[in-house]
Amino acid sequence: MGALGEETRKITDSLDEVGNTTAAIGKGFAIGAAALAALAIITAFVQEVNHSRQEPIQLLLTDTNVLIGLFIGGMIPFLVGSLTITAVGDAAYSMINEIRRQFREIPGLLEGTGKPDNQKCVEIATGAALKKMVMPGAIAVFSPVIVGFSFGPEMLGGLLGGGLVSCILLALTMSNSGGAWDNAKKFVEKGNFGGKGSDLSLIHI
């Protein structure tokens, strides 16, 4: 879109690789810090409930409410993750449709003589990033509130515990798989397995 040269592309690819390495390291620390913070929140929740009532809360697997909360908490991260991935796919398709429209309607764009409407593509990306994240954010925020007020602290404790374990495993899986896919794409684009423009390269894109 910027009509920059091949040398600029090589520089930005190198910077992107450095950024991916830095992000991969940072993600590990971020996941660990988030896990410790969530564990501290669960501990604070148990202590606060024990202070507010006479009988201390017991989060036992033999308790039906705790077990149901564990299943709900383990399910929510996968639901939020699926909604987020779907949002990314929808935004990508919207961007593709807009680019195709510009190729059809803007004279000389395909030949390189016309000027694309970059602002429209930016609006699609930012709009999708804001609108499509409303539902995942609402689920993450309101599900503990609804469960806690509707079914009691035992089920809420189970939800927090199940969500903690599920979130850690899902975050590690997504982080490693996403980094592996991105590096595999760059490996192909550097000339391996057919190089850029091959069928394998198109599949990676």
Language-model-derived ranges and their functions:
Residues M1-D13, Y93-K120, G179, N183-D199:
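Juxtamembrane inter-helical linkers in multi-pass membrane proteins
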Residues E6-A34, A38-A40, D117-K131:
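Multi-pass membrane catalytic core of lipid/isoprenoid biosynthesis enzymes
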